[in-house]
Amino acid sequence: MIPPSGAREDGVDGLPKETASAEQPPSPASTGSQESKLQKLKRSLSFKTKSLRSKSADNFFQRTNSDVKLQADVLAGVSPGSSPLPAPGSLTCTPTRAGLYPGGGGKAHAFQEHIFKKPTFCDVCNHMIVGTNAKHGLRCKACKMSIHHKCMDGLAPQRCMGKLPKGFRRYYSSPLLIHEQFGCIKEVMPIACGNKVDPVYETLRFGTSLAQRTKKSSSGSGSDSPHRTSTSDLVEVPEEADGPGDGYDLRKRSNSVFTYPENGTDDFRDQAKNINHQGPLSKDPLQMNTYVALYKFVPQENEDLEMRPGDMITLLEDSNEDWWKGKIQDRIGFFPANFVQRVHQNEKIFRCVRTFSGCKEQGQITLKENQICVASEEEQDGFIRVLSGKKRGLVPLDVLENI
């Protein structure tokens, strides 16, 4: 049966209306163009991220404005429907040079040509500075930093720390006493203004000397203390019996420190008088302050005392632990404390005539030729016990020469 014409028209009209009401699918050309733009954007961002990671901070902050403009153009080409990205102005804010290098505002090293007379190591490569004829190198005028010529490029991020604090620094001639170039200053000169001395420094120096002298007197033999009757002491020193203040005046006038009295105030006054006069009235105080030189010491300053192995030294002051003041004949000066050996009463001084290698299992020690040692015991079976510095043991008597 053939449907009526009106119904056919409604069905035909209804189909276009249905398709018109539905959404039209996007064309394949427009879809491909959007996907290609997004892929290009992702590639550009990933490429720039990798390049930024591989570069250092300096290269990142020193980029030219053309890179920033290129990035802004790429970001401007993004469709407005995509997710918003940070503005290009936020990426262009770079820190200053001072922020990258906090010490950039410091002083630079003022290096000068220098000839090193002593073994010196480079502060950059830690190798010794050695030249063909002399030890040439560079040294900073302010902080005394020593480097090679070739190590000049390695000091770019460093700055000069300025001059070291003023202090009492000695430059030793023995390799046992060489300190590092920037080691701490162990000795400081007393704070003095005119004739005034810092009371705190004076008190500490006096206490240290008193403790050392007390320990030495207690370790020595009992015959080291003087033996005199109280009558003779009163006759020889009549002005010292007035009161206890006189003993304090004696200690104040003398640089030496006295031991504690064992036999009363008379022995204390007698010992003070002997040390003040520096005379050969008694052998005991002189014997307590007698030392023998173990090694050779070449003076580096005018106040140093030259020593040779075997020289007899009279100790004048030992307030400092490292440097003592002594006298050899008519010469007075300072010398290293570990270069000498104390000589007690009834001790003999020997010099080794040839090298001897001892056996530790048998209590023997090794002595080199011309080495100085001290002995207080008698010979036993051809061996004698000697003391040289920190070494103590048995040595055959035929390798020793009494000096």
Swiss-Prot record:
Entry-linked Pfam families: C1_1 (PF00130), SH3_1 (PF00018), SH3_2 (PF07653), STAC2_u1 (PF16664)
Record localization: Cytoplasm, Cytosol; Cell membrane; Cell membrane, Sarcolemma
SMART domains, sorted: C1 (SM00109), SH3 (SM00326)
Topology in the lipid bilayer: Peripheral membrane protein
Domain SH3, chain residue ranges per copy: 286-345, 348-403
Keywords: Cell membrane, Cytoplasm, Membrane, Metal-binding, Repeat, SH3 domain, Zinc, Zinc-finger
GO BP of this protein: positive regulation of cation channel activity; positive regulation of protein localization to plasma membrane; positive regulation of voltage-gated calcium channel activity; skeletal muscle contraction
Biased composition (Polar residues): 21-36
GO molecular function: transmembrane transporter binding; zinc ion binding
One GO cellular component, as annotated: cytosol
Disordered, as annotated region: 1-43, 212-253
Main localisation: cytoplasm
Phorbol-ester/DAG-type zinc finger locations on the chain: 108-160
Signal sequence bounds: none
Functional note: Promotes expression of the ion channel CACNA1H at the cell membrane, and thereby contributes to the regulation of channel activity. Plays a minor and redundant role in promoting the expression of calcium channel CACNA1S at the cell membrane, and thereby contributes to increased channel activity. Slows down the inactivation rate of the calcium channel CACNA1C.
Subunit-level organization: Interacts (via SH3 domains) with CACNA1S. Interacts with CACNA1H. Interacts with CACNA1C.
Protein name listed in UniProt: SH3 and cysteine-rich domain-containing protein
